[in-house]
């Protein structure tokens, strides 16, 4: 395994193929240990992981905390409503405070895009050894979700060898609210790195035409793309046509909390055109995998029948795979700092 090059993890835009492979290799090891009955190992014993979540979360927050505990790290949690934020303290000063308490890694979720870059820059300026791990920042990025999604697809398409190259030329259909989705942006970086051809499907209000050029937008302070050749992005407005040739589908939630009022004419019309149902799935002659990062809006973007009855609905697999992926990220950051 290569020496891990990142002190902080903000985005997948600056991940190389070797970076992905390092994460997946470790995740495979941790998953194998769990399957063999070993649920806890002393890999991060004596380290402190601090969970700073300024937005609501079920899957990501609890998955990161469980991942840290399985590595034997101490876990420190944070409640915004009972913190000094209510007295006017800034998020950056809050992060510096937890770093001063000895946090080795800050796992941060916040509604502001690029906030983890700002926090990391401040910490580095005071020579802090604390790493920052982005657990979702505004509309920008959700690296661990992008990693666990691609890991779930790799395990589906290549269960014996777990070879990421299996995604090369696969047609991955992403349906729904791409414009407000940090998950979608991370998926675009991750899937394209392994040569997947990505189809974005939804109305123009949720998938503007400029997303066709998304992969030409680097991360802050990034001068070049570490991936030499990426897959493609196309945009479709017809779910029925797109579904016919798809090898996998990722459904996205309508993020009404981030939308401008009246962005969509109606939820019912959106569901009629772009909701994933058994009838629409029947247009594809393969039993393709279905993913959704959660939380689900049942019978809006995805039918309950698909969630509960479709044999290759991998939503629970995604949740399970999130733990070894996040274990790998926490472990790699600590090894970088030693």
UniProtKB/Swiss-Prot annotation:
InterPro entries: Asp/Orn_carbamoyltranf_P-bd, Asp/Orn_carbamoylTrfase, Asp/Orn_carbamoylTrfase_sf, Asp_carbamoyltransf, Asp_carbamoyltransf_Asp/Orn-bd
Example of a GO biological process term: amino acid metabolic process
EC code(s) of this entry: 2.1.3.2
Record: residues binding carbamoyl phosphate: 59-60, 109, 142, 145, 294-295
Catalysed reactions, semicolon-separated: carbamoyl phosphate + L-aspartate = N-carbamoyl-L-aspartate + phosphate + H(+)
Pathway participation: Pyrimidine metabolism; UMP biosynthesis via de novo pathway; (S)-dihydroorotate from bicarbonate: step 2/3
Keywords: Pyrimidine biosynthesis, Transferase
Top-level EC class as recorded in UniProt: transferase
GO cellular component, one term: cytosol
Keyword check for DNA damage: no
SUPFAM superfamilies according to UniProt: Aspartate/ornithine carbamoyltransferase (SSF53671)
Single Gene Ontology MF annotation: aspartate carbamoyltransferase activity
Binding site residues for L-aspartate: 87, 182, 253
Pfam families: OTCace (PF00185), OTCace_N (PF02729)
Assembly and interaction partners: Heterododecamer (2C3:3R2) of six catalytic PyrB chains organized as two trimers (C3), and six regulatory PyrI chains organized as three dimers (R2).
Protein family (similarity comment): Belongs to the aspartate/ornithine carbamoyltransferase superfamily. ATCase family.
Reported function: Catalyzes the condensation of carbamoyl phosphate and aspartate to form carbamoyl aspartate and inorganic phosphate, the committed step in the de novo pyrimidine nucleotide biosynthesis pathway.
PANTHER family in UniProt: ASPARTATE CARBAMOYLTRANSFERASE, ORNITHINE CARBAMOYLTRANSFERASE, MITOCHONDRIAL
Protein name in UniProt: Aspartate carbamoyltransferase catalytic subunit
Gene designation: pyrB
């Amino acid at each position: 395994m290569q020496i891990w090059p990142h002190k902080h993890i903000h985005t997948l835009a600056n991940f190389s193929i070797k970076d992905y492979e390092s994460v997946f290799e470790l995740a495979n090891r941790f998953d194998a240990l769990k399957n063999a009955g070993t649920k806890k190992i002393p890999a991060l014993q004596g380290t402190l992981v601090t969970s700073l979540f300024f937005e609501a979360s079920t899957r990501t927050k609890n998955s990161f905390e469980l991942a840290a505990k399985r590595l034997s790290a101490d876990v420190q949690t944070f409640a915004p409503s009972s913190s000094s934020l209510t007295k006017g303290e800034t998020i950056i000063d809050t992060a510096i405070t937890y770093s001063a308490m000895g946090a080795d890694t800050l796992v941060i979720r916040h509604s502001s895009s690029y906030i983890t870059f700002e926090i990391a820059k401040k910490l580095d300026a005071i020579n802090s050894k604390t790493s920052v791990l982005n657990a979702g920042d505004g509309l920008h990025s959700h690296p661990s979700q992008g990693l666990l999604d691609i890991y779930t697809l790799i395990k589906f398409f290549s269960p014996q060898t777990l070879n990421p190259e299996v995604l090369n030329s696969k047609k991955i259909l992403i349906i729904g609210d791409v414009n407000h989705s940090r998950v979608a942006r991370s998926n675009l970086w991750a899937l394209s790195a392994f040569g997947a051809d990505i189809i974005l499907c939804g109305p123009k209000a949720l998938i503007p035409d400029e997303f066709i050029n998304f992969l030409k937008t680097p991360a802050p302070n990034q001068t070049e793309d570490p991936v030499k050749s990426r897959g493609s992005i196309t945009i479709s407005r017809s779910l029925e046509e797109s579904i016919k040739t798809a090898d996998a589908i990722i459904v996205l939630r309508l993020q009404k909390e981030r939308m401008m009022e009246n962005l969509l004419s109606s939820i019912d019309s959106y569901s009629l055109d772009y909701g994933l149902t058994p009838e629409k799935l029947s247009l594809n002659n393969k039993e393709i995998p279905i993913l959704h990062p959660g939380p689900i809006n049942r019978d809006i973007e995805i039918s309950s029948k698909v969630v509960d009855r479709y044999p290759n609905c991998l939503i629970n697999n995604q949740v399970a795979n999130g733990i070894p992926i996040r274990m790998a990220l926490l472990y790699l950051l600590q090894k970088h700092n030693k």
